[in-house]
Amino acid sequence: MNTALAQQIANEGGVEAWMIAQQHKSLLRFLTCGSVDDGKSTLIGRLLHDTRQIYEDQLSSLHNDSKRHGTQGEKLDLALLVDGLQAEREQGITIDVAYRYFSTEKRKFIIADTPGHEQYTRNMATGASTCELAILLIDARKGVLDQTRRHSFISTLLGIKHLVVAINKMDLVDYSEETFTRIREDYLTFAGQLPGNLDIRFVPLSALEGDNVASQSESMPWYSGPTLLEVLETVEIQRVVDAQPMRFPVQYVNRPNLDFRGYAGTLASGRVEVGQRVKVLPSGVESNVARIVTFDGDREEAFAGEAITLVLTDEIDISRGDLLLAADEALPAVQSASVDVVWMAEQPLSPGQSYDIKIAGKKTRARVDGIRYQVDINNLTQREVENLPLNGIGLVDLTFDEPLVLDRYQQNPVTGGLIFIDRLSNVTVGAGMVHEPVSQATAAPSEFSAFELELNALVRRHFPHWGARDLLGDK
């Protein structure tokens, strides 16, 4: 046990009291992202070190690892606390998404350290999908780069509203206020094109030296703002899902014996209470909530983000992938939607292709009807393309094999987020965020069946010399 943790437990009056205090702290999930070698892993290592979250054996191991793999000369290489893969240590880069946990007296934190290299952008999107705040690192010597713009856009696309622009390595530019101001203005010019109402803050720091990370820097008297840790401890996070209508995707039908039948899952948004009238989609059958069962016993009500099991008063047909919502809410099932896609496979996404998709516990198939545009990350302009390449981001039209109940991703990430799965390899090849569900009334009927369209795409891809025409036409 490290000395800081031991002191906290002693101050709280014992382990049990300390654990209760931890449960009542708010939790902030954030990620670090930016271009390669901007110091993301070093920053996380510095946060863990300066908040005294490192155990003595870890510190001893870090001294030894710094001698073998370190890139900071005689100094401790704090990035090694996070870069766990052997390939990462040998190359001095981050490849996988690394998660770390730490806490202070004010708040608990879960950190996702994401890769900076462009070829690992898909890993970065994975890390951002569960976060509420993004720390965007910028090398003070290089300024705003393409990968900085890419990560900023992906973060906002995935619903992150709080951006902290950490201008790192200020020690290498002599802690220049002019450099900080120039980069700040450059980023704000770019950020004006980002979607949504964003909370953007700027902190000049040196992760290697510890300036403005957990304590105020004496080398930058011109900066009077908060340190990075103070920003993380005080930022107010308003969860969108709390104010949204009730959504409960069924993940598992729990029937341990003949006397109990419950529907387990995580409440995606809103709240549910005993006695509430609920409706099951897509069947439309209604019932009342008889019990809300949790690990700690029965509850009278539950809120977004809580894992619960609902018991209904009636025995009705409900299976994995069904959605429960308030009975008085009208939410029609749709068979088409426009989806913002981050593509993660070497094989490009092309019109006519079909994939398995998973959304809120539901698994079905979807066909790509067309690609409206791909976003140019450098200037956020939209351009027409025939396919979406690896790490490409664009708006895609999908048609599903069966009606689905969808929300816009910005309203509800659970019922609006989906993944694409290759049907042969079973590998996840893309992430999608529902931009707009297309109602049945406005969806244009297809002249051809899903099988005919898929066969047509297969023939055109593998036998182009046959000259088969595109059945999708101008779609």
From Swiss-Prot:
<feature type="region of interest" description="G2">
    <location>
        <begin position="92"/>
        <end position="96"/>
    </location>
</feature>
<keyword id="KW-0548">Nucleotidyltransferase</keyword>
<dbReference type="InterPro" id="IPR011779">
    <property type="entry name" value="SO4_adenylTrfase_lsu"/>
</dbReference>
<comment type="subunit">
    <text>Heterodimer composed of CysD, the smaller subunit, and CysN.</text>
</comment>
<dbReference type="InterPro" id="IPR054696">
    <property type="entry name" value="GTP-eEF1A_C"/>
</dbReference>
<feature type="binding site">
    <location>
        <begin position="168"/>
        <end position="171"/>
    </location>
    <ligand>
        <name>GTP</name>
    </ligand>
</feature>
<dbReference type="InterPro" id="IPR050100">
    <property type="entry name" value="TRAFAC_GTPase_members"/>
</dbReference>
<dbReference type="GO" id="GO:0006790">
    <property type="term" value="P:sulfur compound metabolic process"/>
</dbReference>
<dbReference type="GO" id="GO:0000103">
    <property type="term" value="P:sulfate assimilation"/>
</dbReference>
<keyword id="KW-0342">GTP-binding</keyword>
<feature type="region of interest" description="G5">
    <location>
        <begin position="206"/>
        <end position="208"/>
    </location>
</feature>
<keyword id="KW-0808">Transferase</keyword>
<comment type="function">
    <text>With CysD forms the ATP sulfurylase (ATPS) that catalyzes the adenylation of sulfate producing adenosine 5'-phosphosulfate (APS) and diphosphate, the first enzymatic step in sulfur assimilation pathway. APS synthesis involves the formation of a high-energy phosphoric-sulfuric acid anhydride bond driven by GTP hydrolysis by CysN coupled to ATP hydrolysis by CysD.</text>
</comment>
<feature type="binding site">
    <location>
        <begin position="113"/>
        <end position="117"/>
    </location>
    <ligand>
        <name>GTP</name>
    </ligand>
</feature>
<dbReference type="InterPro" id="IPR009001">
    <property type="entry name" value="Transl_elong_EF1A/Init_IF2_C"/>
</dbReference>
<dbReference type="GO" id="GO:0005524">
    <property type="term" value="F:ATP binding"/>
</dbReference>
<dbReference type="GO" id="GO:0009336">
    <property type="term" value="C:sulfate adenylyltransferase complex (ATP)"/>
</dbReference>
<feature type="domain" description="tr-type G">
    <location>
        <begin position="25"/>
        <end position="239"/>
    </location>
</feature>
<feature type="region of interest" description="G4">
    <location>
        <begin position="168"/>
        <end position="171"/>
    </location>
</feature>
<dbReference type="GO" id="GO:0005525">
    <property type="term" value="F:GTP binding"/>
</dbReference>
<dbReference type="InterPro" id="IPR009000">
    <property type="entry name" value="Transl_B-barrel_sf"/>
</dbReference>
<dbReference type="GO" id="GO:0070814">
    <property type="term" value="P:hydrogen sulfide biosynthetic process"/>
</dbReference>
<comment type="pathway">
    <text>Sulfur metabolism; hydrogen sulfide biosynthesis; sulfite from sulfate: step 1/3.</text>
</comment>
<dbReference type="InterPro" id="IPR005225">
    <property type="entry name" value="Small_GTP-bd"/>
</dbReference>
<dbReference type="InterPro" id="IPR031157">
    <property type="entry name" value="G_TR_CS"/>
</dbReference>
<feature type="region of interest" description="G3">
    <location>
        <begin position="113"/>
        <end position="116"/>
    </location>
</feature>
<dbReference type="InterPro" id="IPR027417">
    <property type="entry name" value="P-loop_NTPase"/>
</dbReference>
<dbReference type="InterPro" id="IPR044138">
    <property type="entry name" value="CysN_II"/>
</dbReference>
<feature type="binding site">
    <location>
        <begin position="34"/>
        <end position="41"/>
    </location>
    <ligand>
        <name>GTP</name>
    </ligand>
</feature>
<comment type="similarity">
    <text>Belongs to the TRAFAC class translation factor GTPase superfamily. Classic translation factor GTPase family. CysN/NodQ subfamily.</text>
</comment>
<keyword id="KW-0067">ATP-binding</keyword>
<dbReference type="InterPro" id="IPR041757">
    <property type="entry name" value="CysN_GTP-bd"/>
</dbReference>
<dbReference type="InterPro" id="IPR000795">
    <property type="entry name" value="T_Tr_GTP-bd_dom"/>
</dbReference>
<keyword id="KW-0547">Nucleotide-binding</keyword>
<dbReference type="Pfam" id="PF00009">
    <property type="entry name" value="GTP_EFTU"/>
</dbReference>
<dbReference type="InterPro" id="IPR044139">
    <property type="entry name" value="CysN_NoDQ_III"/>
</dbReference>
<dbReference type="GO" id="GO:0004781">
    <property type="term" value="F:sulfate adenylyltransferase (ATP) activity"/>
</dbReference>
<protein>
    <recommendedName>
        <fullName>Sulfate adenylyltransferase subunit 1</fullName>
        <ecNumber>2.7.7.4</ecNumber>
    </recommendedName>
</protein>
<feature type="region of interest" description="G1">
    <location>
        <begin position="34"/>
        <end position="41"/>
    </location>
</feature>
<dbReference type="Pfam" id="PF22594">
    <property type="entry name" value="GTP-eEF1A_C"/>
</dbReference>
<dbReference type="GO" id="GO:0003924">
    <property type="term" value="F:GTPase activity"/>
</dbReference>
